[in-house]
C-alpha cells in the first residue's frame, strides 16, 4: 500500500479505452485538471482507437499515454492481458494515489485489477449497475461486479445503483450518489450548434424530417443482427415518411453483420461513426431512438427522446421506471411491434417524451471530484444527488 508524503498533491490516474468511457470521464478529467489540489495523468488503452480519436479531438483531451491496443479479431482475454501488461509499467512509473476507471469495459476491469495488485486506491465511476444475469450483457455484467469488489470508492449514478451495492453488503461509506456524468457532457456539448460532415444528415435536420436513430453494437447482439436489421427494413417500408439513421459502430463484426441487411431502402441512411458533438446533435434532432447502448439510454431522455432498448434486459431500469424507455427486445416481431406502437400513438409518444430523465442534473463531475478529494484527504464530499420527478 502506498502512502503519500505530507505536502504532496494526490495524483489521480484516469484510464479509458472506448468512446463511451471517454464521454463520461471527460468532465471529471477536466474538473481534476483544473483543481489545484490534484495532479493527474490520463491513459488511453486505445480499445476503440478510431472513435477515441474523434472524441479526444472534440474535447481537446490529450492522454499522457496511449497503449494503442486495438487489434482486429483479438479475444477478450488477449485484450485484457495486453491492457494489464501495458498499464503496469505506467503505474510503477507514475505512482498514482488513485486509479479511476468508468463502467464495465475490458479496459475498466484491467485498470482496476492492475491498480489493486499494486495496492492503489480504486475509484469506479458509474458503479452499481446490475442486470442480475452474467450472460447479459456479456462480459460487462461480470466486469462491473469484479471492479466494484476491489474499489475503494464507488461513484453511483442513481439511488437504484446504490441499492444494488447495499444488497451485496457493500460498505455504504464507500458509495456516493453523483448522478451520471454523461449528462454533464451532454449539456455542455449541446450548447452550441453543429454542422454535420455528412451532408445527408445536415439535409435531414434542416428539412425537419422525423428521424429514427438506430445504434446496435453489443457483443451479445451480434447473433441477433439479422433480426434487428430485418426489423429496421420492415419499419422503414411501413413508415416511409421517417428516415432511419444508422451510424454503424467501428467494430468490423458489427459492420459486416448489419450493413448488408439495411443498405437497400431509400429511407435508411447508414453512416460511419460520428464525432461526439455531431452525434449529440443528431440525437437532439431525432424523433425516437432504438439502441442497445447503455450510454444512449441515459442521454436520449435528457432531450425528451423516447428510447426503445434493443436488448432483453437493461441495467438502467431507472429509465424504464421513469417512463422514458421501454424494452423492445432483439426479435424482429417484438421490435416492429414496439416501434410501430410508439410511432402510431401520439399520446403514448407524448407520455414518454414528456417524462423526466432520472440520470442527473449536470453536476455529477463536481460531486465525483469532491468524493475523490475526501478519499485522498484533501477535501470533503458533497451531498448525494437526489432525483426529483
Where are these regions (language model features)?
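Nucleotide-activated sugar donor-binding and catalytic core shared by glycosyltransferases
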Residues: 1-246, 251-389
Amino acid at each position: 500500500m502506498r502512502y503519500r508524503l505530507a505536502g504532496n498533491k494526490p495524483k489521480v490516474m484516469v484510464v479509458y479505452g472506448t468512446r463511451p468511457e471517454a464521454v463520461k470521464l471527460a468532465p471529471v478529467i477536466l474538473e481534476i485538471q483544473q483543481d489545484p489540489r490534484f495532479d493527474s495523468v490520463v491513459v488511453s488503452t486505445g480499445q476503440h482507437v478510431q472513435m477515441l480519436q474523434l472524441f479526444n479531438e472534440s474535447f481537446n483531451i490529450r492522454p499522457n499515454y496511449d497503449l494503442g491496443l486495438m487489434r482486429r479479431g483479438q479475444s477478450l482475454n488477449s485484450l485484457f492481458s495486453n491492457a494489464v501488461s501495458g498499464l503496469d509499467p505506467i503505474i510503477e512509473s507514475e505512482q498514482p494515489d488513485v486509479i479511476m476507471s468508468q463502467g464495465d469495459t475490458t479496459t475498466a476491469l484491467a485498470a482496476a485489477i492492475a491498480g489493486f495488485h499494486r495496492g492503489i486506491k480504486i475509484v469506479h465511476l458509474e458503479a452499481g449497475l446490475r442486470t442480475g444475469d452474467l450472460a447479459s450483457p456479456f462480459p460487462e455484467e461480470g466486469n462491473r461486479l469484479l471492479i466494484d469488489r476491489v474499489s475503494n470508492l464507488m461513484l453511483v449514478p442513481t439511488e437504484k445503483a446504490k441499492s444494488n451495492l447495499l444488497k451485496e453488503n457493500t460498505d455504504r461509506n464507500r458509495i456516493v450518489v453523483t448522478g451520471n456524468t454523461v449528462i454533464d457532457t451532454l449539456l455542455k456539448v449541446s450548447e452550441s450548434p453543429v454542422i454535420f460532415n455528412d451532408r445527408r444528415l445536415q439535409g435531414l435536420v434542416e428539412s425537419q424530417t422525423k428521424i429514427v436513430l438506430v445504434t446496435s453494437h453489443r457483443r451479445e447482439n451480434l447473433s441477433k443482427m439479422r433480426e434487428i436489421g430485418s426489423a429496421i427494413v420492415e419499419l422503414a417500408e411501413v413508415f416511409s415518411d421517417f428516415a432511419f439513421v444508422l451510424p454503424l459502430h467501428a467494430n468490423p463484426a458489427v459492420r459486416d453483420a448489419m450493413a448488408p441487411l439495411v443498405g437497400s431502402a431509400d429511407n435508411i441512411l447508414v453512416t460511419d461513426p460520428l464525432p461526439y458533438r455531431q452525434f449529440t446533435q443528431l440525437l437532439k434532432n431525432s424523433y425516437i431512438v432504438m439502441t442497445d447502448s447503455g450510454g444512449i439510454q441515459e442521454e436520449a431522455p435528457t432531450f425528451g427522446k423516447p428510447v426503445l432498448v434493443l436488448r432483453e434486459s437493461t441495467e438502467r431500469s431507472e429509465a424504464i421506471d421513469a417512463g422514458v424507455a421501454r424494452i423492445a427486445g432483439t426479435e424482429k416481431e417484438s421490435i416492429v411491434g414496439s416501434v410501430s406502437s410508439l410511432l402510431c400513438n401520439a399520446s403514448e409518444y407524448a407520455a414518454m417524451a414528456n417524462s423526466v430523465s432520472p440520470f442527473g442534473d449536470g453536476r455529477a463531475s463536481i460531486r465525483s471530484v469532491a468524493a475523490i478529494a475526501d478519499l485522498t484527504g484533501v477535501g470533503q464530499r458533497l451531498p448525494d444527488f437526489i432525483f426529483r420527478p
